[in-house]
């Protein structure tokens, strides 16, 4: 058996090919093959050699269609990575086609073949060899189709995908969430794709593209963890199958912690659910950033005494609660949830970011000292959830029910579908603690969203009774009292009022609703590293072209102090970690960009506000001089602000000491510093535990 499987792998490497042009094939590399055990399950990356064209092309689904003049692209891919970030709200929204030719080895005969797409924005119709396979509506969840019966083993096969991101107001077909939002609605196959091979009897791949295994943490304490393992089996053969399901939990060293076994009979061409119970004594808990310990669950399926499928899933054991007065508790202990909201976006890449991009994002998140992220406003790629599991980042993840609803059965059903996909695809990630139902649902006038919100909340509870539901609101409305906990999106000091109003608002809300847990799901202000003014900065017009970095910094200083001093705020996620594409925006330094990020859209430059949070959240020694990029000054007398977690800082101007300052809030100020004509060297020095730390910059005054 093992020899045969090795022959199949060699055959795949030799003959599974991609079409760069008609009759011109490049063999897939060994890196494109992910071999899972010896169970007969195989995953082949399906990302290179796609042909692409914008527009609705007649007969593009046909197997013999000539696509030689189309562009060749690799996945992930979007057609809005450039026009979706340049402003004007005129980026292309409509259909486009992807095609790929590949040869299926004859050894695949008898295997089940599935195609999986990480996401497609927003409606995808899939064809294989000219035959319609299926349609998926929704721009952010993975989807899987069984294409076994559409393939011709030993011959060239063609898969064609029509993807459409037409604006909802242009077609009733596209009445799916989100109808509108403050981000570019990019089209494309903007996550990775794969071919997956299994034996006829296997763990299901088509249960809303879930892993087919659900690990329910029924009760977890410091002393024990009661678990239920549910495995969805599929039998795509003509005969009933007697199967044995063996499930094992392994510790991080690879040692077996617990094993259970169950027998089941699966009828032909049907599925079956197998439940298994187990208890783990004295569990090593997943404890966030402190200790993100992970077990591994391995489920093996045997048929006729042969191993026919095997799948692994992460397991992080934890228990938690939210208190309306004292905040969040993880494993019985107070645990501060502070962090960032994100978007899947990067300059010139759009939503087609890579896993390497996600790993860089995680490095930034870890470095700033965040303990939580809000995956706004939609489901993210699986790599981000995996990284959060690994590094102990608590996750709020949500569906794109943003701004408004539509009074139609199809809209409601699709929202339910997207929520089901979100929960089932991410059920086993220990980092995921909260299911988000909606965001700012009253922003656009429309039907009363309350019935749909209630329905979705009930669905989330049915799908997963172990996790709290949550929502992000900017309004005072009855929808605020549907989900288990709540986040408020408040922009005091940006869209209204003063930044100092935030604390007053939070106190009032808590006083009026003492039994309702409240957090901050969004707060932020725009800021450009190319726009500066002397301290103290003036509050700019939000819709104007001037968004100085100094005001953004001051906004976050005031806001964080209001949050930090109120223990009843159960979490806070600032808006946003990165600047991101929102093509309808006409403000700040660059049109088409929401510039509230504390790092630029290209992820290359950290703004001063980033360092404000780092000095508060990360205990590692640091010194940072603010306004570094304010390199040319038009006044000789300036205020210098430095962040540090040292108790004392000494500032030098052109090598001359301007004295030491002390601070209890990480902010150090030198006022009325007189710059010399020409270039000025500024250096801030701290001594922490006997080691010197410093930061340095150069500013010019005069010509």
Language-model-derived ranges and their functions:
Residues 362-365, 372-613, 620-639, 655, ...:
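Substrate-binding/catalytic cleft of secreted carbohydrate-active enzymes
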Residues 11-19, 531, 579:
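Short hydrophobic alpha-helical membrane-anchoring segments
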Residues 1-10, 18-376, 392-395, 418, ...:
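Secreted/periplasmic carbohydrate-active enzymes, especially glycoside hydrolases
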